[in-house]
Amino acid sequence: MTRQPETVLTDPRGGVTVEKCVTEGTFNLDGGSWEVENNVWIVGTAAECAVIDPAHDPGAVLEAVANRTVTHVLLTHGHDDHIKAVRQFVDRLGGETPVLMSHEDLMLWHAVYPDGPAPEPLSDGQQLLAGSVALTVLATPGHSPGSVVFHAPDLGDHGVLFTGDTLFQGGPGATGRSFSSFDTIIESLQKSVLD
């Protein structure tokens, strides 16, 4: 079940909104399968936006986007719960929207999509625009080798950080599975987020 999208931030400077759409589906890794919820973020203006992690339910995410132009699909990492609906979502947008993800997670991408194009690479410090919102890519390996967060320093009173599974409420993201490392996630959070 997908929950109705909610506006979590409205920034009158530039008419920017941040909306959250919670989707449900499965996460599969290391021979296991778990029911999970994922936060899908829609960041931008009434005319255009970027979508971060369009997980599980492309129809619901497309409905939340409404009539806006999606300039980018941004992926925080390559686990299947975050990426397995991406191609269907992009196809429903017309097939031309760029998908960006750290290439440190290409092995995870190719496990879901063995054929076809890989996403465009994201790199630490890269600058992007989501509508009129400036986003900075911060590499935060640990949950996966290519995990990143997106920092919007000009949103709200203190900036906004879109963390994917790098940071959960109460602590760091999950580790203990293939390609993850607790020590690495702590180090990357200290370096990229807390400093």
PLM features: what roles do these ranges have?
Residues 25, 54-56, 78, 104-105, ...:
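Active-site metal-binding loops of divalent metal-dependent hydrolases
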Residues 35-37, 49, 56-134, 158:
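Active-site HxH/HxHxD metal-binding segment of metal-dependent hydrolases
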Residues 49, 145-195:
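Metallo-beta-lactamase
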